[in-house]
Amino acid sequence: MRFSIFSTLLVSLATLSTAAELGIEKTHEVECTRKTVKGDTVQMHYKGTLQSDGSEFDSSYKRNSPLKFKVGSGMVIKGWDEGLLDMCIGEKRTLTIPPEYGYGSRGVGPIPGGATLIFETELVGIDGVSKDEL
């Protein structure tokens, strides 16, 4: 009986982890030799919407000002720290970010708790990387 309960628990946990996967879709691919790595300071343009109703909650395009941050340092949500690795300058991706990789159950501002987020992203630059390194 214990084995049966334990097996059921493992299957349930496996299902939960599958449901919480980060979605990464390359929408505009670019060839390069220098891709983003943890620790890079990057400039990203983005538009963020809620998966539930498509409402936009933020856009760097509207401000005409890309967001600058260090990848993998926790300055942004986990979905960005993981979903923006191995990108080339000029590449575009759509990230589908479950709550576990976003703002969790607490939400923030116009983003409700438990929200799955959709980000259309574009890598504009990597600090210290010149055009001839690409």
Swiss-Prot record:
It catalyses: [protein]-peptidylproline (omega=180) = [protein]-peptidylproline (omega=0). One of its GO terms (biological process) is chaperone-mediated protein folding. Disulfide bonds: none annotated. Inhibited by both FK506 and rapamycin. A motif (Prevents secretion from ER) lies at residues 131-134. InterPro entries: FKBP2/11, PPIase_dom_sf, PPIase_FKBP_dom. One of its GO terms (molecular function) is peptidyl-prolyl cis-trans isomerase activity. Residues 1-19 form the signal peptide. It is found in: Endoplasmic reticulum. Residues 39-127 form the PPIase FKBP-type domain. PROSITE patterns: ER_TARGET, FKBP_PPIASE. Its main location: endoplasmic reticulum. Keywords: Endoplasmic reticulum, Isomerase, Rotamase, Signal. It comes from the Eukaryota. GO terms for cellular component: endoplasmic reticulum. Its EC number is 5.2.1.8. Belongs to the FKBP-type PPIase family. FKBP2 subfamily. PPIases accelerate the folding of proteins. It catalyzes the cis-trans isomerization of proline imidic peptide bonds in oligopeptides. This is FK506-binding protein 2. The gene is fpr2.
